[in-house]
Each structure stands twice: as structure tokens, then as C-alpha cells.
UniProtKB/Swiss-Prot annotation:
Protein family per UniProt: Belongs to the intron maturase 2 family. MatK subfamily.
GO BP field: mRNA processing; RNA splicing; tRNA processing
Name listed for the protein in its UniProt record: Maturase K
One Pfam family per UniProt: Intron_maturas2
Subcellular location: Plastid, Chloroplast
Entries under InterPro entries matching the protein: Domain_X (IPR024937), Maturase_MatK (IPR002866), Maturase_MatK_N (IPR024942)
Organism: Rosa gigantea
Lineage: superkingdom: Eukaryota
Function: Usually encoded in the trnK tRNA gene intron. Probably assists in splicing its own and other chloroplast group II introns.
PANTHER family: MATURASE K
Entry keywords, A to Z: Chloroplast, mRNA processing, Plastid, RNA-binding, tRNA processing
Amino acid sequence: MEEFQGYLELYRSQQHDFLYPLIFREYIYALAHDRGLNRSVLLDNVGYDKKSSLLIIKRLISRMYQQNHFIISLNDSNQNKFLGYNKNLYSQMISEGFAVIVEIPFSLRLVSSLEETETVKSYNLRSIHSIFPFFEDKFPHLNYASDVLIPYPIHLEILVQTLRYCVKDPSSLHLLRLFLHEYYNWNTLITPKKSIFAKSNQRLFLLLYNSYVCEYESILLFLRNQSNHLRLTSSGILFERIRFYEKIKYPVEEVFANDFPATLWFFKDPFIQYVRYQGKSILASKDTPLLMNKWKYYLVHFWQCHFYVWSQPGRIHINQLSKHSFDFLGYLSSIRPNISVVRSQLLENSFLMDNAMKKLDTLFPIIPMIGSLAKVKFCNTSGHPISKSSWADSSDSDIIDRFVRIGGNLSHYYSGSSKKKSLYRIKYILRLSCVKTLARKHKSTVRTFLKRLGPKLLDEFFTEEEQIFSLLFPRTSSTLKRFYRGRIWYLDILCINDLVNHE
């Protein structure tokens, strides 16, 4: 946030929400370049930093003043040169610049909210693991949950229109629309595997997609928080009203504005909970399956009428929490009864009472994880470790460090698993794969290599927490056993490792 402060002050001194001139400022591209050098593991660098220079930026800006030079025909191949450089390089530079500019209103809003609430910077609130304590607190009291896959917008124009609420500058939106139209196929379906979500343009399109999801959630949660009288109203009334307004081509915003009190009758549920990460969300409720089905068909109609996105009801699955597990953030979670026996004594009579309580059970998904390890050649599909041949040319310390880092990341992320036996199996696969890789490099057998190296190699795979507890307590102590059985949620995990994100 510190890197934005100077530009935010400059932006505040100018006309409100007037972002268009910033696209012609060199410092915007310099800022995008600096952020590219320090980007997270989810936004890998693909060569932009190696090829960019201040001279290229100046030439690009001078040509952008002339529309004929700025517009590049889609009929040209990707290898056609623009000012002597690859077209993809300029596409990436402009998209990075757009991302920085469009982020300015959001950064201003965040800074002002922090100043008003006097909130101290807390990265714990952004941790992925912070979702699971919420599950532990709320979900044991709920009965049904819906797995909702948020559909991608079918047209790029929908992504641009979602920015109009926070970016009041029409020129910026028109320029963004022109850029998207010229560099990408306007009528292409947007999916994560398409080129439009390539790593070179990920920051811009993640921003556009998050704006789209933010608008969807803002309307959904507003209706949830302000609603009344659900059980007095039939769901068919709402659907017929939506279809009527759709036929006469009224915007859905006017539907909510003109007939808002009647619409809200549909949504009342004081026990509903909503959680989302990326494109997957969970809607859980304590009420009956009828209510969950109403929410299901409302979401389908809402996407169709407001975002013009076709979504099938089959994409939303409703399950009973006590009988089905739900897959979220790499964990298989379920609600299980935890029965404790309490002995009570009344005068001379004593009796036993079974006290049943529900608790959240989070399991390590062993089968998908073995599939992920097999995909990157750490083991075969049955889970038998194999050598990583592509790493055999690296130094011994490099090979060990890579395996230890992967094992540490998995142990760190899956520390909240209720049963860690499956996690230990994955760590065993990584250890043996590491030994086989080293043995292959030195043209030796695994047994001979282990005898020569000793047990110190395997000690590298213990996590920092395991090493500390091993020093403080003997292996047979009850404290260490509770550590291995207990769940630990970390509030410093901001992204998911590629091996973890196996969905």
C-alpha cells in the first residue's frame, strides 16, 4: 500500500475519478514494472521485466496518442512487430498499466476505510485458514449446504460494465473496452484455461473478475441482510416478476428499485451463512431443503437476468451436512457427532448420560493429492515414489531444498487436518522420491545412498513445529501425541500452493 501513497495524493488533487490521463504517464508503467518484480507466486513473471525499458515505454506512449498506431488489427499474427517489438509485450505492458490505474479507486476506498475505523494493518484477516475457524463456529449448527460454482461472464463487456460503479471516468472505460476489443477475441467465452487469463495478463483480468464477483455478492448479501417475510411468499411470484421485467427489457436494477419490498419477501433466513474463495462458494442454512431450493433457483435467474450468464441448476448441489462432505480449499470437511459420556449422581443413584455434540471434521484428501504428485512425477498413480528425473542435474542441496520446501508447504497448509496419517504418507512419498532422485544423480542404489548419507537427510523433512516439540518433549509424551492429533490453523497463509490447489 505504501507504493500507492504518492500517486494517491496526486490523484486526490486532480478531478475526482478522472483516470484517463494516467494511461499516458511513465510512472504508471514504472510502478507496474516494480510490482512485477515483487509479485506473488500466483503471478509468475513471464519475461516482461527482462524486455521492458523506459525507452520502450516512451515510444509506446507516443504512439498511443495516435489512434492508428494504437489499434493493432486482430488479423496480424502474434509475431508481428509493433515499433520493432513483439505485440504480446505491448499487450502485457498496457494491461499491467490498466491494472494499476483501475486499482487506484479501490485503494482510495481502502485507505479511507482504514482511516475512519483506525484499523491497524492486520494480514490475519486475509488468511485462507481464517475461513476454517468460521466453519467450526457456524456449520455445526446448520443442516444444509449448497456448493455454488459462480459462472464466468460470457462476454467481456460484462466485465467492463461492472467497473462503472467505482470508475466514473467514461474515457477510461472506453479505452479499456477498445484495448480488450483489439487484443482479444471479443466473443470468446472467458474460462480460466483460455488465453485471456494467461499469466502475462493475470493482474488485469483478476481485477475485472473480482469486480464482477463483488457486484454479485453485494446484491446477494444486501438482500440477505435486509429481507423479511420469507415464509409468507411463494417463490413463483418472484420468478414471474423477474421474467416479466426481462421481457419488457427493464434493467434488473429497476426491478429491485421499483418493487423492492415485495421482492424481499423471498429471502428471509436468519441462519444462512455464505463463504466464497475464488469461483467457488458455499451457502449454508439451518432451514428446510425447500428454502435452499428457493435460493438455488433465485441464483440461476439472477445470473441470467442481471449478468446475462446462462447457468444450469445442476451446477448448484444441495447436501445435508450430517450425511455429506463438502470440498473447499483443499480440505474434505464434514459435520460429525462427537459423543461424550457424563456420569451424574443424584443422592444415592448414579447414572450415565450421552452428550452428543456436533463438530467439524477436516480431512486430508489423500487420493487427489496423490494424483497431483503423480502429475508432477513425484510418484506413479498408485502412490509409489519415483525419482524426479528433471531435477537430477541440480546440486544435492538444491534437490533437497526443493523437496523440503514442498513438504513444508503441505505440512503448513494441512496442519488443520483432523487425521494426519494421510499427510504423513504424502511426506513419506516426498522423502523417498528425494532419495531416489539423489541416488539416480549419483548412479547409486537407494539403500547404498541412505547408508552413506545417514538419517540426517530424513530429519530435513520435519517441520519447524515438529522439531521444537521433539526437543521439548519425548516422543512418547502425551503432549506430543496431542500435537500430532490436534488441528492448527495458521493466519499467515495468503495463497494456495499449486500442489494444494488440485481441484
